[in-house]
């Protein structure tokens, strides 16, 4: 049962090639529409969202943030949001439900922040290990806690996104598997429940994309 349940996340292979990972790059097909002479309502709406995110990330980074650094996190938000939404459609592979992708995004970002911070702002990074107002007797204990919490950051970023994507898809799969054994009346309620769950899953895709980008921005602001 568990093997069949999680099989929706298995990358299928054709000629020993995992072609369904190519769904990650389907967003490239939408880029040419940005350069139309007359932008569509979708482009105007999307640009307004990106402008709002740019202002918010700029505020989080503070005056010490480098020019153009917000575009990294806006691109990260766009990539995750697109892949989350594509995973809601039938027969499209959900790449963000795999740690292969989420760790590939979180770990290099965290490593870059840490290397930049420890090389250029060493005293500032040491100061972060001891919260202000900590009693002297608790300082060694707090250094251990802060060090561990810093090390597990990329893991929590990746696992949070992956777990949320897996949970919603598993619920939809479980409900769908019970459909053939139900009566017509119960199937009607099942469809209503699945539609409601799909709406909630759509909200989760947006929230998790935003959380991933905001936390990455906050981690970046700590090393400046």
From Swiss-Prot:
A GO molecular-function descriptor: proton-transporting ATP synthase activity, rotational mechanism
Transmembrane segments: 17-37, 72-92, 99-119, 125-145, 155-175, 184-204
Its membrane topology: Multi-pass membrane protein
One of the GO BP terms on file: muscle cell cellular homeostasis
Gene Ontology cellular component annotations, sorted alphabetically: mitochondrial inner membrane; proton-transporting ATP synthase complex
Keyword entries, A-Z: ATP synthesis, CF(0), Hydrogen ion transport, Ion transport, Membrane, Mitochondrion, Mitochondrion inner membrane, Transmembrane, Transmembrane helix, Transport
Cell compartments where the protein resides: Mitochondrion inner membrane
InterPro entries cross-referenced by the UniProt entry: ATP_synth_F0_asu, ATP_synth_F0_asu_AS, ATP_synth_F0_asu_bact/mt, F0_ATP_A_sf
Domain of life of the organism encoding this protein: Eukaryota
Role played: Mitochondrial membrane ATP synthase (F(1)F(0) ATP synthase or Complex V) produces ATP from ADP in the presence of a proton gradient across the membrane which is generated by electron transport complexes of the respiratory chain. F-type ATPases consist of two structural domains, F(1) - containing the extramembraneous catalytic core and F(0) - containing the membrane proton channel, linked together by a central stalk and a peripheral stalk. During catalysis, ATP synthesis in the catalytic domain of F(1) is coupled via a rotary mechanism of the central stalk subunits to proton translocation.
Family to which the UniProt record says this protein belongs: Belongs to the ATPase A chain family.
Complex and partners: F-type ATPases have 2 components, CF(1) - the catalytic core - and CF(0) - the membrane proton channel. CF(1) has five subunits: alpha(3), beta(3), gamma(1), delta(1), epsilon(1). CF(0) has three main subunits: a, b and c.
Listed name of the protein: ATP synthase subunit a
Organism ancestry: Eukaryota, Metazoa, Ecdysozoa, Arthropoda, Hexapoda
Gene: mt:ATPase6
